[in-house]
Structure formats: structure tokens, C-alpha cells
Design a protein with these regions (language model features):
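N-terminal glycine-rich phosphate/pyrophosphate-binding loop and immediately adjacent elements
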Residues: 56, 64, 74-251
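N-terminal secretory signal peptides
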Residues: 1-15
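Conserved flavin/dinucleotide-binding core of flavoenzymes
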Residues: 42-77, 131, 444, 450-622
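Mid-domain catalytic core of redox enzymes
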Residues: 370, 374-503
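N-terminal export leaders
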Residues: 16-31
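Conserved beta-strand->loop/alpha-helix structural units within folded catalytic cores of enzymes
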Residues: 89-99, 118-120, 378, 405-412, ...
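Active-site rim elements
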Residues: 142-151, 246-253, 318-327, 427-432, ...
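Active-site/ligand-binding neighborhood in enzyme catalytic cores
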Residues: 233-376, 573
């Protein structure tokens, strides 16, 4: 299918009008909930953050003040000083910040006054909940943090999950979701006309997967040059240890210090066109281009090439053991909030949390021990007289609150700007930890029948903005059920990052370029991309982009995955001297949580770091 002459008109750019009826769909929300939830659902349709569509994640209004008073170094405005002194102020209402408040209550007592500040209009940080109510039935999307890697839980995290009532075994048993690998053809590739000259869906193969999904037998269908096809055929056919002459230490050194694309070129014989097919393969798992990874990292992530170093790829081990809620780990954030502020919802359990409506008006009430103040951007933190002063902007005004203790549960890279009194070495370590960009675009479609007709539930898109897309059906819990065989409306998740320009050579330049591009793109650009892909992929199966796309929510995370150390770009730091270890050192009554403090982009890491940060405050004996 050729690209339409007037793509904007033919792609049916009408999402703005569709979004206007989103609130009308919410009127039916109470009808689909248990009676105890109706009262909480009815008064909040217009301002309920999880239902907001278009640009979410780092949404408009969540980052401009931070950029102005940190990156652009405008002087912080003179604040209005609020009289109340809190026992604890937490900066950041993500899972780590919420867990810090939870642990603080356990360490110091439930009566302690806690204020949690966050620059977003919703809590949860990257654990973002997307709700869709078009048509009256609620559909959930994962706006950021996906799942629980339960096999990595330490006793601290396990105890928290048990206290919240999270039953991993039950979650696993209720879920049949597998990132789109549940269709008749578990693996599929879609080549688009704009990049490759024609739209081409190829089922049964993958660029990253077990040996049975090798594209070798499908290469003649690829819309690429004959030269690239011949190179790929040789690459996939060759079975030889090309590093046989290297001693074990030299072999390890090569695998860790050689870029994957250099390996593909020098040992695999792949030219630029063939190599480019793999460029986006790690967007979802790493938030990076594949050429940023070493050979060892890329092969460990499932990219091809083991056959060139004398190893045989395994057919097993491709199942990723994880536990899911329908809104991802937003359910963990919501369980924590309901524990900290019971007034947000009644009778909350881990079983019912997916369908529970929250009263956001209850988050910041003076009578409560814990308060969550959203849309509040912290711009300065100082210590004086045994107290921490926290200055923030909300509604165009500056305020300052005082606290005995403060936990910074926000991105490390912003800390040097808002905590100017920190030691220079600590600020340098914090600035080092630049996050990896990520984008998750959730699209509600009228019916999943076109996917079923094509025999797919997911597909990789090597030429498009989002590296992959997949249906979100199959995660069921607590009254929320959207089975794999449900032919009705469904959420399609588009997952990936934004490729930097070729001119960005080093890693930091690439991350900066991707980050700036992500924030600069208007919603219409993401919308046009989604419609082009769904129209090209599903058009022959009867999908009409104007009729069948009901809503689009773009979760853009320019500061996404925590900075995990890379073979090609980070040195082997001495114990205790890694940037994240220096960055998280307690400074007076100030401690540091967030997954950055563990240099690991996982929910359990965020919880572990919250526990450590609060224990450091306990050790002050104040």
C-alpha cells in the first residue's frame, strides 16, 4: 500500500473530537463498578488524571518550571513561607517516594506529618495508569512501569508486597498476556512503505527471538536490497567460532569492549542497510539504539550473533517470568496511596485495585497525617537550623515548607540544580546519571478483529517511531477482565524510544537529542504516526483509522529508564565509588531514594532505595 497523497486527511485526524466524548463515557463508569465505588467515581469525571489522553507522562505543565529554574538557571522566585513544619517532605510521588512515606510511618510512627510533592498532575511517577472509557466499559493501559520481577525481590520488597496483599502466584495465574506473542503467529515483522518502499507484513519470524523465529527462510520477502539479503543469509547461516584464537580473557574483553554494530560489520559481514534493521530492537528493553550496546549486552538481550562465536542459541529461556496488573505497577502506587491516605477510596485491596476509583480531592487535606500535593515542582532545597526548607512552584506561585527530614525521590540528574549546597563530588555523580528516554503510546481501538484476521497480537516495526506494538488483552484481576479471545475494543500499546540523529555520536549526545525530540513533538505528530502504522498494518483486514481509533494517550518519558552502566560508555568503578553510590550519600537531614540510587530501572530497586533512605534518617536519632 502506497503512502496516501494527503496523509493527514486520509489518516482521519479527528482524535480531538473523539476526546471530547471521553467524559461522556465516564458517566457510565459508575454503572460498571461495585456500588461502593460509585460515589467516588461520579464527582471526578472532568479532572480525573488517569483518564486524560493525548500527551501524558512528562505532560505539558510538568517540566517547564523545572527547566526554567534549573537548566535555564532563572533565579528561584521569592516564596510564600507556609507555617506548618512537617516531619518529612518527600520530593517525588513515584513508587520510591510513596514507599519512603510508608517506611517513614513504620519507623517513626503513623502520626508523623508527611508531605509528598510531585510535579505531575498524577502520582505514581513512571508507574502511570491510563484509563479509557469510550463506549462505557473501562479499558486500562500501562503508561510506564510494566511488571513485577518477583524473582529479584529481596525480603524488604517481599514484606511490602505481602503487607499490601499482592499475591504473585494469583497474578501469574490470572494473566495470559505475553507482549503480543499470543496470536496465531507469536512473532511478526511489519515493514512500512515510507521507509522500505512498500508495506509488508511477515509473520513467523523475528529479528530478536528464539532460533525457531529466525528470519533466514523469510529474507526473500524482506523489502530490502538483494545485497542486504545476501549478507543476512550468510550471517544467519554461518556456524563458526570466529573468536576461537582468543584466550578466555581476551575473548571476554572483545565481547565487552566491541560495539554490537561493529561486530555485525566486521565478523558478521553486514553492511549499513542490513545492520540498520536491528537498530530499534532494544528500544523497549533498554531505551537505546542497538549500536550503543556491546556485543555481550546485545547478545544477552536476544539479538543474533551467537552462531559467530561458537555458541548455539537456546530455544528455551525466552519466557519472561513477571507478574502484571492491568495498569502495570500503577496498582502498586495506588495501593501505597490508599494505605497512606485511606480516604482516597474505601475497601481497597490488591484484588480490587484495578477497578477502584480514587478521590483525588482527598490527597491533600490538612487533617491527614500524609498529604500528596500534585502539580508542585520543587526548585530549591536548603538546610538551616536543623530543618530542611523545600521551595516549590504551584499554580504560578512559589511556596516554601519546612521539614525535619527530607527524602529526594526524584531524578538524580536534576539534584545538582535544586540542592546547590551538596558537595561538588556528589553533584557530579548525580549529574552523571542521565536516564534513557522511553515512550509508551496506548491506543484504544474499536475491535481487535483485524489483528485476529491477520493472526497476530503484536508486531515489530523496524522502520517506525515505536519499535513494537502489541495488544494489552489477557491481564485479568479483581473484576477487570479482557480475555485474549475478546473480539471487542482493545488497547494497543506502542512501545519504544526515539532514535537520535546520526550526528549525535556519543551516548550523552544521543540521549539528549532523543529527549529533546520527544518533548518537541506535538501530539499531532504522535497521532499521525499511530494512524499511519495501524492503517498500513491493519488496513487490508478492514481497519479504518477514522472509524476504529477511539483514543490515543502518549506517555512520553524523556527521563525514562534509570542509568544502568554500559560496557562501552561507563568504566568499571571501584566498590563504593560508582556514581549512584556517591550520589545517594546522606547529606544532613537529606537522603536520596529513586531507582537512580540503585542504578537499576526496576520497581523493586525503587522500593529498596526508599527503605535505605528512611533507615538513614532513623540512624540520625532526631
Amino acid at each position: 500500500m502506497n503512502e496516501p497523497k494527503n496523509p493527514k486527511r486520509e489518516l482521519g485526524m479527528r482524535i480531538h473530537r473523539r476526546d471530547l466524548i471521553h467524559g461522556a463515557g465516564l458517566l457510565g463508569f459508575g454503572l460498571s463498578l461495585p456500588r461502593s465505588q460509585k460515589a467516588a467515581a461520579e464527582p471526578i469525571e472532568a479532572s480525573y488524571p488517569p483518564t486524560r489522553t493525548q500527551l501524558r507522562g512528562s505532560h505539558p505543565g510538568s517540566f517547564e518550571a523545572a527547566h526554567a529554574y534549573t537548566r535555564d538557571q532563572l533565579p528561584p522566585p521569592k516564596p510564600r513561607r507556609l507555617p506548618e513544619i512537617f516531619d518529612l517532605v518527600v520530593v517525588g510521588a513515584g513508587i520510591s517516594g510513596l514507599a519512603a512515606a510508608y517506611y517513614y510511618q513504620r519507623q517513626f510512627g503513623p502520626d508523623k506529618k508527611i508531605l509528598i510533592l510531585d510535579n505531575h498532575d498524577d502520582f505514581g511517577g513512571h508507574a502511570k495508569r491510563n484509563e479509557f472509557h469510550q463506549g462505557g466499559r473501562m479499558h486500562l493501559g500501562i503508561g510506564g512501569t510494566h511488571n513485577l520481577e518477583y524473582w529479584q525481590f529481596n525480603p524488604v520488597v517481599t514484606d511490602l508486597m505481602n503487607d499490601l496483599g499482592v499475591d504473585i502466584k494469583t497474578l501469574r495465574a490470572q494473566s495470559t498476556f505475553d507482549y503480543g506473542r499470543t496470536g496465531k503467529s507469536p512473532y511478526a515483522l511489519w515493514f512500512d512503505a515510507e521507509t522500505f518502499g512498500r508495506d509488508q507484513l511477515i509473520t513467523g519470524c523475528s529479528l530478536k527471538g528464539p532460533p525457531s523465529t529466525s528470519p533466514l527462510l523469510f529474507l526473500d520477502q524482506f523489502p530490502i536490497s538483494d545485497t542486504a539479503k545476501a549478507q543476512l543469509k550468510r550471517f544467519y547461516t554461518l556456524q563458526q567460532d570466529l573468536l576461537a584464537d582468543l584466550a578466555p580473557e581476551a575473548r571476554t574483553h572483545y565481547l565487552r569492549t566491541t560495539g554490537y554494530f561493529d561486530f555485525l560489520r566486521d565478523l558478521g559481514g553486514l553492511g549499513a542497510e542490513a545492520r540498520q534493521l536491528f537498530s530499534k530492537s532494544c528500544h523497549g528493553s533498554w531505551g537505546l539504539e542497538a549500536h550503543c550496546l556491546s556485543v555481550a549486552e546485545a547478545l544477552g538481550d536476544g539479538l543474533p550473533g551467537l552462531n559467530l562465536i561458537g555458541e548455539t542459541p537456546s530455544e528455551s529461556g525466552w519466557d519472561y517470568p513477571a507478574a502484571f496488573f492491568p495498569d502495570g505497577n500503577a496498582s502498586i502506587a495506588r495501593l501505597l496511596v490508599s494505605r497512606l491516605i485511606p480516604a482516597v477510596a474505601k475497601d481497597v485491596t490488591a484484588t480490587s485495585i484495578a477497578t477502584q476509583a480514587f478521590d483525588y480531592g482527598a490527597l491533600d487535606q490538612a487533617a491527614q497525617s500524609v498529604r500528596i500535593r500534585l502539580s508542585s515542582t520543587v526548585v530549591r532545597v536548603n538546610q538551616s537550623g536543623g530543618l530542611v526548607g523545600v521551595r516549590y512552584l504551584k499554580g504560578g506561585q512559589a511556596f516554601e515548607v519546612k521539614a525535619r527530614h527530607t527524602v529526594m525521590a526524584c531524578y538524580h540528574s536534576i539534584l545538582p540544580y535544586i540542592c546547590p549546597d551538596l558537595p561538588a563530588e556528589q553533584k557530579a555523580a548525580q549529574a552523571y546519571q542521565v536516564k534513557y528516554p522511553l515512550v509508551l503510546t496506548n491506543v484504544l481501538i474499536r475491535s481487535k478483529k483485524p489483528f485476529d484476521q491477520l493472526g497476530i497480537h503484536g508486531v515489530s516495526c523496524p522502520g517506525r517511531m515505536h519499535a513494537s506494538l502489541f495488544l494489552m488483552n489477557g491481564i485479568n484481576t479483581g473484576g477487570y477482565e479482557h480475555a485474549l479471545n475478546d473480539p471487542g475494543a482493545a488497547v494497543v500499546a506502542f512501545w519504544g524510544s526515539l532514535s537520535p540523529p546520526a550526528s549525535a555520536l556519543d551516548l550523552r549526545a544521543q540521549l539528549r537529542a532523543s529527549r529533546e525530540q520527544m518533548l518537541a513533538l506535538p501530539f499531532e505528530a504522535y497521532e499521525s504516526e499511530v494512524r499511519l502504522v495501524l492503517g498500513g498494518l491493519l488496513g487490508d483486514a478492514g481497519f479504518n483509522v477514522d472509524r476504529d481509533i477511539l483514543a490515543i494517550t502518549v506517555n512520553r518519558w524523556p527521563h525514562g529508564y534509570a542509568h544502568e552502566y554500559l560496557d562501552l560508555w561507563d568504566e568499571d568503578f571501584a566498590p563504593g565509588q560508582a556514581p549512584h553510590e556517591l550520589a545517594r550519600a546522606r547529606f544532613g537531614n537529606l537522603t536520596f531514594a529513586n531507582s537512580d540510587a540503585g542504578a537499576s530501572a526496576y520497581t523493586h530497586t525503587a522500593i529498596e532505595e526508599a527503605f535505605r533512605a528512611v533507615n538513614e534518617l532513623r540512624d540520625l536519632r532526631s
